[in-house]
Each structure stands twice: as structure tokens, then as C-alpha cells.
From Swiss-Prot:
Glycans are attached at residues 105, 108, 146. InterPro entries: OligosaccharylTrfase_OST3/OST6 (IPR021149). Residues 23-185, 242-273, 326-343 are lumenal. Keywords: Endoplasmic reticulum, Glycoprotein, Membrane, Signal, Transmembrane, Transmembrane helix. Residues 207-220, 295-304 are cytoplasmic. Its main location: endoplasmic reticulum. It is a multi-pass membrane protein. This is Probable dolichyl-diphosphooligosaccharide--protein glycosyltransferase subunit 3A. Component of the oligosaccharyltransferase (OST) complex. It is found in: Endoplasmic reticulum membrane.
Length: 343
């Protein structure tokens, strides 16, 4: 009797097990699991690995009840300023948070899920999607069967950052993301603290202004500011800021070395601009020294020595700038003397 009971029990367990294998998770179960994962993820971006790609994409028959937009990331490339992966990742999370906020109470909120795949432990997924370069974003629609044929963002779609990503999502999914909700630069608490500081310091500032005891009344501050503005203008700082140029890059032939100067006229590293700006500033300061200090020296010999020293340093600085320009552009600068001098 005991043997028969054990056999019946084992048979029952086997039937349940086979039934489970024959009936994988339904679409609603997968969608609910994605919603659960999204609720615990930062900005609603779900971290995927190789198993998740198989579970939620390749193992699910089409049409799926949801779309997935995936950002491909590589932590070891975050230091590459030209790729700007951390910035694009933040913008992608911003689009995700905006979409969830604006579609939280609607059925559309469960039709699209934002995900990210990191290359360290998911190289197989990169190969499945045929990811050859970063940044890369793929949209897996409900009818996508071949992952290599998923909708991908073009290079131009990244120019507008979060706004361009939102346009791509709306164009491909017909869902509404709405305007991007960027976090304020200053929180309400910080604004309150700043206002309190201004209110407290206003009487003190007014008193100092009336007495002429502020930094704006100190001629040395204006002198330093003028030198800074001059250096800022001649060193190409705005070029570096606008184009986000790095100070230096690693040598392609030897990764242990750094490159500060590039022999290319269309590209300039930050170190190049600062070097040229420093030389220009030296010449400008020497000119100010000669016209404001040397002329007041009473001894003629000291005047001449100071003038010769200033001219020598200025000549050296200008020569370095000309040499760098010749090296980058490949064009030589030749002096042309008046015909009467050639005698």
C-alpha cells in the first residue's frame, strides 16, 4: 500500500513538472515581470543580460505585447570623451523617466520598456544585435524576429540628446513621450538657502559698497581679470568648451603615452590651445611691462637690459607659435623684404 502511494505521488509530481514545461509563462506574466523590474530600477531602465534577452525577446512568440528599447553600454569606454557614453546614458534614463511619468496610469505605459545591456557580461547580446560601434540604441518592436533587423538610431538622432531619443521613440512606436522633464539645476532647498543668504548679506554689502571696500574697488582684481580674459580669448577656450575637446588623448601605438599636440589643422586639443594662449599672454604681459614699468626706470642701462630681455623672450614666444602653426598646417611662413632693401 505504501509503495502504491509513493508511485502515485511521484507520478503526480511528474505530471505537474511536464505541465509546467509545456506551459511557459504567458504574455501577461512576462509583462507583469517587466513592470516589476521597472519599478525597482533607477529611472525605470531595466538592466538586461543574455538570459533576459532570451527570456523576454527571443523565446517569446511574435507579436509580443510590448516593445523594448535598449541602450548598449560599455563601462570600460566611459573614459573616452569622444563617445560620451555616460552623457548619452543619462539622457536615455531621462527619456525613460519622462515616459513613465506621462504614461503611468495608462495602458500605453506597459507597451514600452526601457532597458540597457552592458558589454562586460553580455557580449553574446552585442553579437545578437550586431552592435559594432557605440553609442547604439535598438528598438525591438512586437513583430521583430531577427534582432539584427531591429530599428536602430542613426548618428544624427543622437545630436539632440534626450529630445532626439524621444522623437525616435515616438516615431517608431507611435507612443507619446511628451516633453522631456529635466531635473532643476537648483533644488527648492538650495533656492531657499540662497535667498536667505542674500537677505542677510544685503545690508552688509550695501555698507561696503558705499564705503568703497568691495573687491570691485580693488584695481588688482581688474588687472587679474583682464589678464584672464585675454588668456581665455587667445587660448581657444570657447572652441574647447563648445566642441568638448579633451586636453589630451592616448597614443594609439602606445597606450601608456599621451598625445598633447596633433599634426592636423582641423583639430586642436585643449593642451595646444593653452600652450599657445600662454605664449600670447607672456608677450602681452611683457608689452605691458615695457610700456608701464621700464619707461619709468631712471637708469638708461637698466632700461636697455630690460628692453633686450623683453624683446628676446617675445621673439622666442612668437617663433614657437609660428613653428607650431607650420607643423600643424604644413605651410611655411616666409619673410618678404622691400625691393629697395635687396639692393
Amino acid at each position: 500500500m505504501v509503495i502504491q502511494t509513493n508511485l502515485s505521488y511521484r507520478f503526480f509530481i511528474l505530471i505537474v513538472f511536464l505541465f509546467t514545461l509545456a506551459n511557459p509563462k504567458s504574455d501577461s506574466d512576462l509583462k507583469n515581470e517587466l513592470v516589476s523590474l521597472r519599478s525597482t530600477a533607477e529611472s525605470g531602465v531595466i538592466s538586461f543580460n543574455n538570459d533576459d534577452v532570451s527570456k523576454f525577446i527571443t523565446s517569446v512568440s511574435t507579436p509580443r505585447p510590448y516593445s523594448l528599447i535598449i541602450f548598449f553600454d560599455a563601462v570600460h569606454l566611459h573614459g573616452n570623451s569622444q563617445l560620451r557614453l555616460p552623457e548619452f546614458r543619462r539622457e536615455f534614463r531621462l527619456v525613460s523617466a519622462t515616459f513613465i511619468t506621462n504614461n503611468n496610469n495608462e495602458s500605453n505605459g506597459t507597451k514600452l520598456f526601457f532597458c540597457e545591456i552592458e558589454s562586460t557580461h553580455s557580449e553574446a547580446s552585442f553579437r545578437r544585435f550586431a552592435v559594432e560601434s557605440l553609442p547604439h540604441i535598438s528598438l525591438v518592436s512586437p513583430t521583430t524576429e531577427n534582432l539584427t533587423e531591429s530599428d536602430q538610431m542613426d548618428g544624427g538622432d543622437f545630436t539632440g540628446l534626450a529630445e532626439s531619443m524621444a522623437e525616435f521613440v515616438e516615431r517608431q512606436t507611435k507612443l507619446t513621450v511628451c516633453s522631456i522633464q529635466r531635473p532643476p539645476l537648483i533644488s527648492k532647498t538650495q533656492i531657499g538657502i540662497i535667498v536667505a543668504i542674500i537677505i542677510i548679506s544685503t545690508p552688509i554689502l550695501i555698507k561696503k559698497i558705499l564705503k568703497g571696500e568691495t573687491l570691485l574697488h580693488d584695481h588688482r582684481i581688474w588687472l587679474v581679470g583682464a589678464v584672464f580674459v585675454y588668456f581665455f580669448s587667445v587660448s581657444g577656450t570657447m572652441h574647447n568648451i563648445i566642441r568638448e575637446m579633451p586636453m589630451y588623448i592616448k597614443d594609439y601605438e602606445d597606450s601608456s603615452k599621451f598625445v598633447f599636440f596633433i599634426e592636423e589643422s582641423e583639430m586642436q586639443l585643449g593642451a595646444e590651445g593653452f600652450f599657445v594662449g600662454f605664449l600670447y599672454t607672456v608677450v602681452g604681459l611683457l608689452l605691458a611691462f615695457v610700456t608701464n614699468v621700464v619707461v619709468r626706470v631712471k637708469k638708461l642701462d637698466e632700461q636697455r637690459m630690460a628692453m633686450l630681455l623683453a624683446l628676446s623672450i617675445s621673439f622666442w614666444a612668437v617663433r614657437k607659435v609660428v613653428y607650431l602653426d607650420n607643423w600643424k598646417t604644413g605651410y611655411e611662413i616666409y619673410p618678404y623684404w622691400p625691393s629697395s632693401w635687396r639692393g
